């Protein structure tokens, strides 16, 4: 199993990136919390990884820190929560927002994440109650965009943001509406976070 990946960042097409490690290109799915912390293209990158082996595919998920990976692993242990849904949760809610929603049994907030219905939200609360507070929080804080990685939000970058939102389960219409909350001149990583916050509003 691959637990850590160190190499050169070749491509960024949220939520997937391509990392060259020893001449091999690894396709890695990352949550937006990690995407926002990535360096620029052709820069060194280190990710903590989780490998999921299925009959039809071997999937690699990457995270900026161990604690974020541990939270992902806690999520996928819950019945009905797979890798894609866990990424959507980590992308749509900050760790403190997720912990607060679980502690307050806030089904409404959890259900705003695409793919999370009432029953899944109830299972999340039941399984995670009392567990999130024990996670290290140092590398789960809201990340700032990586230095040198800023890109202006123009047509291509807006397409990347829309693609990322749709990969998380939002519809094209929802993604387009969320883009209206992203000011011109905002870098892509921040644009994704702003769009997700807009989608999380009641």
UniProtKB/Swiss-Prot annotation:
Subcellular location: Cytoplasm
Region of interest (Domain I), ranges: 1-64
Gene name in the database record: ruvA
SMART domains assigned: HhH1
Keyword terms: Cytoplasm, DNA damage, DNA recombination, DNA repair, DNA-binding
InterPro entries: DNA_helicase_Holl-junc_RuvA_I, Hlx-hairpin-Hlx_DNA-bd_motif, NA-bd_OB-fold, RuvA, RuvA_2-like, RuvA_C, RuvA_C_sf
Lineage: Bacteria, Pseudomonadati, Pseudomonadota, Betaproteobacteria, Neisseriales
UniProt-annotated stretches for the region Flexible linker: 144-152
Function: The RuvA-RuvB-RuvC complex processes Holliday junction (HJ) DNA during genetic recombination and DNA repair, while the RuvA-RuvB complex plays an important role in the rescue of blocked DNA replication forks via replication fork reversal (RFR). RuvA specifically binds to HJ cruciform DNA, conferring on it an open structure. The RuvB hexamer acts as an ATP-dependent pump, pulling dsDNA into and through the RuvAB complex. HJ branch migration allows RuvC to scan DNA until it finds its consensus sequence, where it cleaves and resolves the cruciform DNA.
Domain notes: Has three domains with a flexible linker between the domains II and III and assumes an 'L' shape. Domain III is highly mobile and contacts RuvB.
Annotated S-S bridges: none
Region Domain III, annotated ranges: 153-202
Entry GO CC: cytoplasm; Holliday junction helicase complex; Holliday junction resolvase complex
Matches recorded under SUPFAM superfamilies: DNA helicase RuvA subunit, C-terminal domain, Nucleic acid-binding proteins, RuvA domain 2-like
GO biological process terms, semicolon-separated: DNA recombination; DNA repair
Family stated for the protein in its record: Belongs to the RuvA family.
GO molecular function: ATP binding; four-way junction DNA binding; four-way junction helicase activity
The UniProt record lists the keyword Transferase: no
Region (Domain II): 65-143
Protein name: Holliday junction branch migration complex subunit RuvA
Assembly description: Homotetramer. Forms an RuvA(8)-RuvB(12)-Holliday junction (HJ) complex. HJ DNA is sandwiched between 2 RuvA tetramers; dsDNA enters through RuvA and exits via RuvB. An RuvB hexamer assembles on each DNA strand where it exits the tetramer. Each RuvB hexamer is contacted by two RuvA subunits (via domain III) on 2 adjacent RuvB subunits; this complex drives branch migration. In the full resolvosome a probable DNA-RuvA(4)-RuvB(12)-RuvC(2) complex forms which resolves the HJ.
């Amino acid at each position: 199993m691959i637990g850590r990946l160190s190499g050169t960042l070749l491509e960024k097409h949220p939520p997937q990136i391509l990392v060259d490690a020893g001449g091999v290109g690894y396709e890695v799915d990352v949550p937006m919390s990690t995407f926002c912390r990535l360096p620029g293209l052709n820069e060194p990158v280190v990710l903590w990884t989780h490998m999921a082996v299925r009959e039809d595919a071997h999937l690699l998920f990457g995270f900026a820190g161990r604690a974020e990976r541990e939270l992902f692993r806690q999520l996928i242990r819950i019945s009905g929560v797979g890798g894609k849904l866990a990424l959507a949760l980590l992308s749509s809610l900050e760790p403190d927002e997720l912990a607060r929603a679980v502690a307050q049994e806030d089904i409404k907030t959890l259900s705003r994440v695409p793919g999370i219905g009432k029953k899944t939200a109830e299972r999340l609360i039941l399984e995670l109650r009392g567990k999130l507070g024990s996670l290290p929080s140092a590398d789960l804080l809201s990340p700032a965009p990586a230095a040198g990685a800023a890109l202006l939000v123009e047509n291509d970058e807006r397409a990347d943001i829309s693609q990322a939102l749709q990969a998380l389960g939002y519809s094209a219409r929802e993604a387009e509406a969320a883009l209206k909350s992203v000011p011109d001149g905002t870098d892509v990583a921040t644009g994704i976070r702003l769009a997700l916050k807009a989608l999380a509003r009641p």
